[in-house]
Amino acid sequence: MKINLDRTSSGFCIGVQGTIHVAEEKLAQSGELYCLGDVVHNEVEVKRLEALGMETIDIPAFEELRNAEVLIRAHGEPPSTYETARKNNLAITDTTCPVVAKLQRTAKMLHQLGYQVVIYGKKVHPEVIGINGQCDDEGVVIKHPDLSDPEEIAPLDLSRKTALISQTTMDVPGFYELKRNLEKLFAEHGHRNPGTQSGEWMAVRDIDITAEKTGALAMPKLVFKDTICRQVSSRNGKLRDFALANDCIVFAAGRKSSNGQVLYSICKDANPHSYFIEDVDEIRPEWFVGENGKPVESVGICGATSTPMWLLEKVANYIDKTFGDGSSNPNA
């Protein structure tokens, strides 16, 4: 049984890498550090850092904290968090992902320009909370691209100029499905950009938003900006190919990980013999037995952008030593 470890489309993205690196440096220096929320949506990695001295706190604990250093994770935070830190004399170590920080600036400018900001994402996801905070919490968050949830679309004002953006870790097909359905919905109520017959919304760039802000060039009433992180979304096709190339897939990620859910679905769709775990204690021997009753020939190990490579290596070594012959050398 050959163990194949995916090193090209699994493991930390750049944003998470930066956060973990800074956290490790701070802990090595002082042995203690507060983190607002889970530093990454992977329980195994959180526990590793907590063993080094990190203390994970929630919003109520953060609001009571005084004269301490607090890490802001890659997901980012709303403006209210920084205001609380200022009032409470807290030193902020800000590791907001550059892609997320750019998105926050985009959302803020669109809101200031009077656009109703629609966010494709999950309302309770920390990144979305941070983005919506830039819109004074007035953004409309939609998770279902087919507009099937009445509560999600109830706040939509179909008469306002509107801009669609996305949480960085959402799926690209879902974003464009939502765009098409919003175009149709607004057009049905008589709202479309001038000169368009079927209600197409205009794609805008940062330079267009800046031009609108400075008065140099006006944007249409209905616009969209694809803000999904391409470092994340580019993994989709590679992971699909990886899943197809192996008899069995073991996908390691935290169950809180939005990106993990998306990537696991891709694996499962490509290869029904795909299994989700958080750690090695969830691995089952029957996964590695083929329909002929013999061991499968290949097992692929992969994970999310929030899954540390050391955990994937741990999973690969465990499977090789426990169910294989120990000769696969998955760390090569």
UniProtKB/Swiss-Prot annotation:
User: Any binding details for the cofactor?
Assistant: Binds 1 [4Fe-4S] cluster per subunit.
Which pathway features in its UniProt record?
Isoprenoid biosynthesis; dimethylallyl diphosphate biosynthesis; dimethylallyl diphosphate from (2E)-4-hydroxy-3-methylbutenyl diphosphate: step 1/1; Isoprenoid biosynthesis; isopentenyl diphosphate biosynthesis via DXP pathway; isopentenyl diphosphate from 1-deoxy-D-xylulose 5-phosphate: step 6/6
- Which InterPro entries does the entry mention? LytB/IspH (IPR003451)
Q: Which residues bind dimethylallyl diphosphate?
A: H41, H75, H125, S257, S258, N259, S306
Q: What is its EC number?
A: 1.17.7.4
Binding-site residues for [4Fe-4S] cluster, renumbered to this chain: C13, C97, C229
Supply the enzyme class, top level. oxidoreductase
Q: Where does (2E)-4-hydroxy-3-methylbut-2-enyl diphosphate bind?
A: H41, H75, H125, T168, S257, S258, N259, S306
What this protein needs as a cofactor is: [4Fe-4S] cluster
Catalytic residues at: E127 (proton donor)
Where on this chain does isopentenyl diphosphate bind? H41, H75, H125, S257, S258, N259, S306
Annotated keywords: 4Fe-4S, Iron, Iron-sulfur, Isoprene biosynthesis, Metal-binding, Oxidoreductase
Highest taxon of source: Bacteria
Q: What is the protein's known function?
A: Catalyzes the conversion of 1-hydroxy-2-methyl-2-(E)-butenyl 4-diphosphate (HMBPP) into a mixture of isopentenyl diphosphate (IPP) and dimethylallyl diphosphate (DMAPP). Acts in the terminal step of the DOXP/MEP pathway for isoprenoid precursor biosynthesis.
Q: What is this protein called?
A: 4-hydroxy-3-methylbut-2-enyl diphosphate reductase
Q: Name the species this protein comes from.
A: Chlorobaculum tepidum (strain ATCC 49652 / DSM 12025 / NBRC 103806 / TLS) (Chlorobium tepidum)
